[in-house]
């Protein structure tokens, strides 16, 4: 509410709009966040944070063409943007352009081979391509690099479940829960173990 109050005095204050939009995102009010990010971009068409977050909202809405426009604008401004490139790889995956997604992720892994998140992202694409063995190799590497990355255990647990390796799946789901994933989120998977 204090952000809204401040905007009464400076309705186009970009930092205030960005802060309020971030709070809206954290509280699941993406429609309001979207409005604020649009207002920021009306004032500053090159605002990288607003482009990135609006593209993310477009992905949530499944408005992939609009997301692509924002990611491309962001990457024109900052071709090395980690979040922009990872977002574009995610977009390619959502559009089932798996090769394009892998190309982006492979380049990023070459540049930063110690980034566990990139291995998890690539493993997810490989899983969708039905290359579970490659995905498991990437997940092993991700866990080696960062043993507290819950997403790696979640994805590996789901792959194990698909492969009918229920004991391994259960162990990974339990590890993900110990790392902060709510039990309710994994209730269905655990019942299948």
Each language-model region and where it sits:
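Position-specific recognition of the canonical hydrophobic site in helix A of tetratricopeptide repeat
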Residues: 18, 25, 52-55, 59, ...
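Helix-start (N-cap) detector for alpha-helical repeat units in TPR-like alpha-solenoids
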Residues: 14-15, 48-49, 82-83, 116-117, ...
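Terminal, low-structured helical/coil segments at or just beyond the last alpha-helical repeat
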Residues: 161-193
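Structural signature of tandem alpha-helical TPR/SEL1-like repeats
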Residues: 1-5, 27-39, 61-73, 95-107, ...
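Alpha-helical adaptor scaffolds
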Residues: 56, 83-99, 103-133, 137-139
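Alpha-helical segment of the N-proximal tetratricopeptide repeat
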Residues: 1-8, 15, 19-26, 56
């Amino acid at each position: 509410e204090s952000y809204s109050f401040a905007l009464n005095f400076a309705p186009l204050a970009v930092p205030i709009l960005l802060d309020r939009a971030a709070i809206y995102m954290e509280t699941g009010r993406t429609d309001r966040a979207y409005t604020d990010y649009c207002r920021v971009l009306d004032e500053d068409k090159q605002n990288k944070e607003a482009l990135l977050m609006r593209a993310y909202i477009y992905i949530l809405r499944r408005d992939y063409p609009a997301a692509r426009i924002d990611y491309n604008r962001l990457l024109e401004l900052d071709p090395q943007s980690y979040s922009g490139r990872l977002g574009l790889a995610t977009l390619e995956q959502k559009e089932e352009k798996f090769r394009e997604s892998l190309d982006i992720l492979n380049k990023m892994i070459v540049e930063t081979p110690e980034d566990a998140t990139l291995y998890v992202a690539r493993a997810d694409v490989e899983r969708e391509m039905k290359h579970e063995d490659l995905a498991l190799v990437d997940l092993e590497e991700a866990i080696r690099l960062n043993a507290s990355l819950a997403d790696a255990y979640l994805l590996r647990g789901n792959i194990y479940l698909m492969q009918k390796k229920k004991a391994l799946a259960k162990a990974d789901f339990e590890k993900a829960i110990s790392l902060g994933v709510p039990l309710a989120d994994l209730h269905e998977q655990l019942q299948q173990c």
